[in-house]
């Protein structure tokens, strides 16, 4: 509960982004016109990024072997002999050999191979938040006002060359920028203004910043009219799913469906705190907190961004029922490889949480797996056969 209270108070100090490349297709489908086929997809392993408690330096990675059914906690430490750091905040599968992890309060971006071996770090992007990539560069949001010798009034986006792990360009955006996505060469950044409670220089943000990814120049800011655009951003082609937390008092949380082709958006009157996509639909678990009642209200919805049709529930009746039984939903994730759906329960926010997995038909993939404190991010790694 300590961590959750910090989350509420700080608004945005705690919570996988990707590029605009299409999701990987299942194995066995033709990869090239010449008839060459990809290896057969046999299954997948999972990495769970546990944030731990902010400022406690107890973040962890958990690894689930889908072949053996064995969960390994403290995975990064067991592989590398050292801790991952304080509050790992995002994890991104960049390519077949590289995974990036923003470790927020340790002020580093840690790189690992899929076997967990550390293979470098970027250390001059403090208070780093979320990531996306085009395969050559990594784009990272930061709440900080400094990157190396550069200073900024607001927050910024850093562009990192993945060959050298060096920052090659930056662009100042809004106050406390959070989620980031890439579409047709344009970066879309959701700004929160989450420090407005302690910084009198600004209010909560309502803008989405558009940045040219090649030149790293600001194209424009789009005012959404929705405050505190904090949390995960899922992307289904041209559409983005963006959460608006509200102010936990009188301004209610909402969510946006943002169309990157037209740079227009639709607003829905419920939050999408935890959200994911199968490439066509958005699946959301919204968490609404009120200081007046000191209580949470949860929402489960499925949204078709092309038609704006909204349905109650997530995926199927089994998953919806299980989500309703959780004490503290903390992440939801659909694998781009199998379309299996995974989600976590943070429980008390101070002790180990649990990972759950189901097929889209509602079949349980494994018994609930004990992970670590605040399991906030999930990444699937495909297992291929010849």
Task: Give the predicted meaning of each segment.
Residues 70-83, 116-123, 166-171, 217-224, ...:
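A short beta-strand motif characteristic of beta-propeller blades
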Residues 169-172, 177-289:
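Acidic, serine/threonine- and glycine-rich low-complexity intrinsically disordered segments
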């Amino acid at each position: 509960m300590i961590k959750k209270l910090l989350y509420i108070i700080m608004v945005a100090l705690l919570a996988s982004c990707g590029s605009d490349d299409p999701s990987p297709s299942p194995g066995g489908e033709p990869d090239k016109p010449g008839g060459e086929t990809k290896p057969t997809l046999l299954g997948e392993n999972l990495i769970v990024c546990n944030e731990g408690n902010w400022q406690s330096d107890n973040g962890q990675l958990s690894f689930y072997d889908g072949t053996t059914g064995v969960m390994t906690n403290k995975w990064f430490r067991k592989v590398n002999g050292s801790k991952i750091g304080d509050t790992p905040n995002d994890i991104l599968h960049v390519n077949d050999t590289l995974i990036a992890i923003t470790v927020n309060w340790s002020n580093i971006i840690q790189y690992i191979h899929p076997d967990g071996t550390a293979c470098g770090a970027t250390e001059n992007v403090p208070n780093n938040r979320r990531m996306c990539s085009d395969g050559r560069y990594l784009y990272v949001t930061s709440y900080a006002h400094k990157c190396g010798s550069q200073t900024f009034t607001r927050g910024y986006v850093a562009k990192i060359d993945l060959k050298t792990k060096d920052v090659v360009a930056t662009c100042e955006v809004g106050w406390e920028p959070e989620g980031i996505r890439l579409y047709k060469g344009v970066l879309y950044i959701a700004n929160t203004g989450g420090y407005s409670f302690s910084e009198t220089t600004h209010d909560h943000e309502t803008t989405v910043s558009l940045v040219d990814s090649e030149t790293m120049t600001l194209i424009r800011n789009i005012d959404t009219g929705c405050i505190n655009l904090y949390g995960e951003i899922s992307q289904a082609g041209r559409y983005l799913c963006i959460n608006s937390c509200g102010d936990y008092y009188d301004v209610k949380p909402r969510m946006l469906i943002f169309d990157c082709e037209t740079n227009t958006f639709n607003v829905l009157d419920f939050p999408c705190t935890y959200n994911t996509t199968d490439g066509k639909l958005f699946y959301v678990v919204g968490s609404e907190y009120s200081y007046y009642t000191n209580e949470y209200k949860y929402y489960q919805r499925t949204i078709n961004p092309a038609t704006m049709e909204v349905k109650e529930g997530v995926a199927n009746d089994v998953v919806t029922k299980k989500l309703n039984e959780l004490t503290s939903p903390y992440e939801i994730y659909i694998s781009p490889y199998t379309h299996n759906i995974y989600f976590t329960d943070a429980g008390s926010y101070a002790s180990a949480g649990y990972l759950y997995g189901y097929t889209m038909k509602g079949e349980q993939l494994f018994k609930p797996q004990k992970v670590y404190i605040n399991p906030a991010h999930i990444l699937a790694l495909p297992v291929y056969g010849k």
